[in-house]
């Protein structure tokens, strides 16, 4: 790893640099309590591996190239990760590399095969394995550059890792002016269901709850609008108007995802697993009786 000062650059400026350098990159950042930036923002680019799944077909491309037909796609991911485990090094940021991407709702079908899951155009999952990470330390106003390397050929791979660190530092220090972000006209949205249809869905859901069939459900609508430019301009607005514990900007070959979420569904850190879903959560009691 390598440290450089970050007092003259922001995570968004870094993201813009990555956008000019790579077709596959990400930014992960967080605001705690809706008012204070978390210590780290994480960025990465040029993943060494991409793993996608659709209808039980897992495709790996990059460091490994193969296709696997399976009804347990997560087992393929576990197998891949077993070959890319990094040691825990005291003092480094909590994320030093790994898979970044998304799991679609259709993944539920592998755990509950009896459910009739409607699959859309999205893959069941789309994950990229990043061995290079830029960790922006808001507290110390430093950037930690991290490169992971394989140990099968230490001298050769160490040389490549050092070269990658130099390239990352040069990318961050590049002062070439970037073109301004374009802002298009106000978008026109269309919805996949009408207001009347959605009202009926909500009423039917309430009936299920009153009858005791279910205790909660999340109903949603999909709004769509054509948009020709990068979502980065919209993400800049999103992160300032709706700062949240989990904010993401992800770009894969021109397809972009941005999101802002308050919910910790599952978190694993230092061997401790935490879940705190917003929907249905209630305070724990101090005793079993209070629970």
Annotate each PLM feature:
Residues 1-291:
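Extended alpha-helical targeting/anchoring segments
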């Amino acid at each position: 790893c390598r440290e450089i000062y970050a007092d003259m650059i922001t995570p968004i400026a870094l993201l813009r640099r990555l956008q000019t350098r790579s077709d596959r990159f990400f930014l992960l950042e967080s605001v705690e309590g809706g008012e204070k930036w978390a210590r780290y923002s994480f960025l990465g680019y040029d993943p060494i591996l991409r793993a996608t799944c659709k209808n039980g077909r897992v495709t790996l491309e990059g460091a490994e190239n193969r296709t696997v037909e399976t009804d347990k796609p997560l087992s393929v991911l576990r197998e891949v990760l077993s070959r890319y485990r990094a040691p825990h090094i005291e003092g480094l940021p909590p994320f030093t590399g790994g898979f970044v991407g998304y799991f679609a709702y259709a993944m539920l079908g592998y755990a509950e095969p009896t459910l009739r899951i409607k699959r859309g155009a999205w893959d069941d999952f789309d994950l990229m394995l990043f061995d290079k990470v830029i960790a922006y330390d808001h507290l110390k106003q430093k950037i930690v550059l991290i490169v992971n390397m394989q140990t099968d050929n230490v001298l050769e791979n160490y040389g490549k890792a050092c070269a990658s660190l130099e390239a990352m530092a040069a990318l961050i220090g590049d002062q070439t002016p970037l073109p301004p972000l374009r802002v298009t006209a106000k978008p026109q949205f269309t919805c996949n269901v009408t207001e009347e249809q959605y009202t009926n869905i909500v009423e039917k859901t309430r009936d299920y709850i009153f009858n005791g069939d279910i205790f909660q459900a999340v109903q949603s609508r999909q709004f769509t609008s054509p948009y020709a430019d990068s979502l980065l301009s919209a993400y800049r607005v999103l992160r300032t108007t709706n700062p949240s514990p989990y904010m993401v900007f992800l770009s894969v070959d021109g397809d972009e995802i941005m999101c802002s979420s308050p919910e910790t569904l599952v978190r694993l850190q230092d061997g401790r697993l935490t879940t705190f879903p917003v929907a249905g959560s209630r305070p724990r009691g101090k005793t079993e009786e209070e629970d």
